[in-house]
Amino acid sequence: MEVNILGLIATALFIIIPTSFLLILYVQTASQGSKS
């Protein structure tokens, strides 16, 4: 049970962290593009 929960947490972090990072980069690029 604990292993499954830790696995889900690790998988969630592995997916959320890169996704949020790319999302932030996209938002910054989009905002800069609209400004200029």
From Swiss-Prot:
InterPro entries assigned: PSII_PsbM (IPR007826), PSII_PsbM_sf (IPR037269)
Coiled coil location: none
Main location as per UniProt: plastid
Membrane topology of this protein: Single-pass membrane protein
Record's keyword annotation contains Glycosyltransferase: no
Gene Ontology cellular-component annotations: chloroplast thylakoid membrane; photosystem II
Keywords, in A-Z order: Chloroplast, Membrane, Photosynthesis, Photosystem II, Plastid, Reaction center, Thylakoid, Transmembrane, Transmembrane helix
GO biological process: photosynthesis, light reaction
TM helices/strands, residue ranges: 5-25
Tagged with keyword RNA-binding: no
Top-level lineage group: Eukaryota
SUPFAM superfamilies for this protein: Photosystem II reaction center protein M, PsbM (SSF161033)
Subcellular location per the Swiss-Prot or TrEMBL entry: Plastid, Chloroplast thylakoid membrane
Physiological role: One of the components of the core complex of photosystem II (PSII). PSII is a light-driven water:plastoquinone oxidoreductase that uses light energy to abstract electrons from H(2)O, generating O(2) and a proton gradient subsequently used for ATP formation. It consists of a core antenna complex that captures photons, and an electron transfer chain that converts photonic excitation into a charge separation. This subunit is found at the monomer-monomer interface.
Annotated family: Belongs to the PsbM family.
PANTHER family xref list: PHOTOSYSTEM II REACTION CENTER PROTEIN M (PTHR35774:SF1)
Subunit structure and binding partners: PSII is composed of 1 copy each of membrane proteins PsbA, PsbB, PsbC, PsbD, PsbE, PsbF, PsbH, PsbI, PsbJ, PsbK, PsbL, PsbM, PsbT, PsbX, PsbY, PsbZ, Psb30/Ycf12, at least 3 peripheral proteins of the oxygen-evolving complex and a large number of cofactors. It forms dimeric complexes.
Protein name: Photosystem II reaction center protein M
Source organism of the structure: Chlorokybus atmophyticus
Originating gene: psbM
